């Protein structure tokens, strides 16, 4: 049994005098039920154990409810259903929580839903991919899954235990064990936040990436072409946004704020472009730490990105 969602988080303004079209997220959201029609489903991963293991600043376990509160009062422009499936809560047993989240993702995908994960530290990424892989392996022997990560960090660290710095190395190992291709594209990499050893590791694994300084509005056509080339090489897409890809002025509420980063309009544009490919199967937003946020700036940006993925 999974814990029920806390629907009390979905509160906000009601503009009843404006008519039926004056809807907001909190009015449209429904708790997930097993007989729900295929739609977008929000699933939280309340964890920062991976951040702690990675020597980061804790607090991301409070990210999922903060993100729901930021979403609640946004105007709703869709017609499709949307559900809240609650949170998988991780204590200090991160590996067990990742397994539980992966199974929940696989079950939801099997029912025809598109899952949008709410983090939580970026340790959510391994759990998300494992769930997608579990689902696709039931239907395809050699699925071509693309991993699109908006992030200042490669997150390819070697460590004795899983952390927020290891998810894509874990995914690479899972792909190797399954004899699947490891198709990883990372947009927004900071040279100053990744050692030469991590760049070498990325090269060995065939990672495609663009640096934060390359992802500028004046260079958008090249960024689009780079992304399109990656999307054309895969059949299924897992998209994850680590909020530390954004400049610290826009997203202060993360464990490791970026001095440079990639501006929100560029990130949002490329997220929407990836979604428009028709290959998106699963997405998540990671590293929201409301304890470090200022005026809910990071939560509001995260909410806008979730809306871009859903509507």
UniProtKB/Swiss-Prot annotation:
Pathway involvement of the protein, from the record: Amino-acid degradation; L-histidine degradation into L-glutamate; L-glutamate from N-formimidoyl-L-glutamate (hydrolase route): step 1/1
Mitochondrion recorded as keyword: no
UniProt keyword Iron present: no
Cofactor(s) needed for function: Mn(2+)
Catalysis: reaction(s): N-formimidoyl-L-glutamate + H2O = formamide + L-glutamate
GO molecular function, a single term: formimidoylglutamase activity
Cofactor binding remark: Binds 2 manganese ions per subunit. Can also use Zn(2+).
PANTHER family from the UniProt entry: ARGINASE/AGMATINASE (PTHR11358), FORMIMIDOYLGLUTAMASE (PTHR11358:SF35)
Protein name (record): Formimidoylglutamase
Source species taxonomy: Bacteria, Pseudomonadati, Pseudomonadota, Gammaproteobacteria, Pseudomonadales
């Amino acid at each position: 049994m999974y814990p029920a969602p806390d629907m009390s988080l979905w509160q906000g303004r009601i503009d009843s005098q404006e008519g039926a079209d004056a809807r907001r997220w909190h009015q449209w959201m429904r708790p997930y039920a097993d007989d729900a029609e295929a739609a977008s489903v929000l699933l939280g991963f309340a964890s920062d154990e991976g951040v702690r293991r990675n020597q980061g600043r804790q607090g991301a376990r409070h990210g999922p409810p903060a993100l729901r509160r930021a979403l609640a009062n946004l105007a709703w422009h869709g017609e499709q259903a949307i559900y809240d499936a609650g949170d998988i809560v991780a204590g200090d047993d991160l590996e067990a929580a990742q397994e539980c989240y992966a199974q929940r993702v696989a079950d939801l995908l099997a029912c025809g839903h598109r899952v949008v994960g709410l983090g939580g530290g970026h340790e959510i990424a391994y759990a998300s991919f494992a769930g997608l892989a579990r689902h696709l392996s039931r239907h395809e022997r050699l699925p071509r899954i693309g991993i699109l990560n908006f992030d200042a960090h490669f997150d390819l660290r070697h460590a004795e235990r899983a952390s927020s710095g290891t998810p894509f190395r874990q995914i690479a190992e899972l792909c190797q064990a399954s004899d699947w291709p490891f198709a990883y594209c990372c947009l927004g990499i900071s040279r100053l936040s990744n050692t030469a050893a991590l760049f070498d590791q990325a090269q060995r694994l065939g990672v495609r990436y663009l640096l934060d300084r390359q992802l500028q509005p004046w260079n958008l056509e090249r960024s689009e072409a780079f992304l399109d080339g990656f999307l054309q090489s895969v059949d299924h897409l897992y998209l994850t946004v680590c909020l530390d890809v954004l400049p610290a002025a826009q997203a202060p509420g993360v464990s490791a704020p970026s001095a440079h980063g990639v501006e929100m309009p560029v990130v949002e544009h490329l997220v929407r472009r990836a979604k428009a490919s028709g290959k998106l199967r699963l997405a998540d937003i990671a590293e929201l730490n409301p304890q470090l946020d200022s005026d809910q700036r990071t939560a509001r940006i995260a909410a806008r990105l979730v809306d871009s993925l859903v509507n």
